[in-house]
Amino acid sequence: MNSTALEPTLEFARKLDQEDPLRHFRDEFYLPPNSIYMDGNSLGLLSKRAEKTLFTILQDWKLLGIDGWTKGTYPWFDLSEKIGAMLAPLVGASPEEVIATGSTTVNLHQLVSTFYQPEGKRTKILADELTFPSDIYALQSQLRIHGYDPSTHLIRVKSRDGRFLEEEDIIAAMSEDVALVVLPTVLYRSGQILDIQLLTDEAHKRGILIGFDACHSIGAIPHSFSEWGVDFAFWCNYKYMNGGPGCVAGLYVHRKHFGSAPGLAGWFGSKKDKQFDMEHTFTPSLTAGAYQIGTPHLLSLAPLIGSLEIFQEAGIERIRQKSLQLTNYFMYLIEQELSHFGFIIGNPKDDVRRGGHISLEHEEAARICKSLKENGVIPDFRAPNIIRLAPIALYTSYEEVWNVVQIMKKIMQEKQYKKFSNEREVVA
């Protein structure tokens, strides 16, 4: 979408909606009444299909009891593998390389406990200072388990400007004492996409394994994890994937690592034909299924089935195309209408580097977010000064983007935000 061809009018926004090939998917979702939802990068909305598959699993439990493990609409015993196969195209992997299991942080613990093998002088883990805090907590914990001090053994690449990371800085930090690299695919504040293939290649040239947190990219951008040679990745399924609060997460392990014993063993990581032999000798699956630990949380897994059906129909390439058009249009309107109110666009403007959300910086960000909510817009605040706005390709309209900017303009003109305190709420 060429910004020179854009117009700041409501009529133009409606024209874009009429031309949108994905517009019919909006009817698949329950939209909060009297609201414009801009927080799908924190929690995606419920679709009617996700609701249906949840009720289906409940009905099977109701009617079949324990036989639901092998009978019913979606037999539970291998459901994690089947959902993994549905997730695989979204991360560019084979079905065997992906499994739906655990939570983001549990899966990170599992993968680091498997692939962090300190030996000789290779004892350190490389991360970055802008990543999501839970990843840092997990890495620090894993280092302590191995007897290392995180203050000396967890390297965090610094940002030059507090917004973005430079690949050259990350590569320069891949020293001979680094055993493992764990980075985000997309930075959760600024929405910057890192060059995953370049970083993977450079890590492997130095004999270092590398994994990625894909929480802010899964369902928003295409990936080619297998082709790029990424060793492992992990993500949540409740943001762009619309799997619901607490939805079971996902992980990917490159097939070259199949046969490696998982660091955290549990009975659902067994080969399926051995699991109920009840032997005390663990026989791990020869796929990513080996990295499961306990019994799957089926009621938190069920909505993902319906959600993934929508992704299969829409296609991640078309989703990405519309997402870029939405955020490009958003930035255009912000520059047209809000340039005199002190906002700074803190996300990359380049399509290749921009994820699925807009990151607006303002010294009154927390107050403005509260005022937006009062005006029916649901944004997201990240300390100290960031307003995140995520127009979601499957259910956000161009007219809604136009309306959000008009509401923000009115808030700033009338200084409506001044009646609120400039601090975050319990859940930002």
Swiss-Prot record:
Modified residues (N6-(pyridoxal phosphate)lysine): K239
Residues given in the record as pyridoxal 5'-phosphate binding sites: T104, T105, F132, P133, S134, D135, D213, H216, Y238, W267, T295
Enzyme class, UniProt record, top EC level: hydrolase
Catalytic activity: L-kynurenine + H2O = anthranilate + L-alanine + H(+); 3-hydroxy-L-kynurenine + H2O = 3-hydroxyanthranilate + L-alanine + H(+)
GO biological process: anthranilate metabolic process; L-kynurenine catabolic process; L-tryptophan catabolic process to kynurenine; NAD biosynthetic process; quinolinate biosynthetic process
Gene3D superfamilies: Aspartate Aminotransferase, domain 1, Type I PLP-dependent aspartate aminotransferase-like (Major domain)
GO cellular component, one term: cytoplasm
Disulfide bonds: none
Pathway(s) served: Amino-acid degradation; L-kynurenine degradation; L-alanine and anthranilate from L-kynurenine: step 1/1; Cofactor biosynthesis; NAD(+) biosynthesis; quinolinate from L-kynurenine: step 2/3
SUPFAM superfamilies: PLP-dependent transferases
UniProt keyword Endoplasmic reticulum present: no
Keywords of this entry: Hydrolase, Pyridine nucleotide biosynthesis, Pyridoxal phosphate
Keyword Hydrolase part of the UniProt annotation: yes
GO molecular function: kynureninase activity; pyridoxal phosphate binding
Cofactor: pyridoxal 5'-phosphate
Domain of life, per lineage: Bacteria
EC number: 3.7.1.3
InterPro entries: Kynureninase, PyrdxlP-dep_Trfase, PyrdxlP-dep_Trfase_major, PyrdxlP-dep_Trfase_small
Role according to the record: Catalyzes the cleavage of L-kynurenine (L-Kyn) and L-3-hydroxykynurenine (L-3OHKyn) into anthranilic acid (AA) and 3-hydroxyanthranilic acid (3-OHAA), respectively.
Assembly and interaction partners: Homodimer.
UniProt family annotation: Belongs to the kynureninase family.
Protein name according to UniProt: Kynureninase
Organism per entry: Geobacillus thermodenitrificans (strain NG80-2)
Gene: kynU
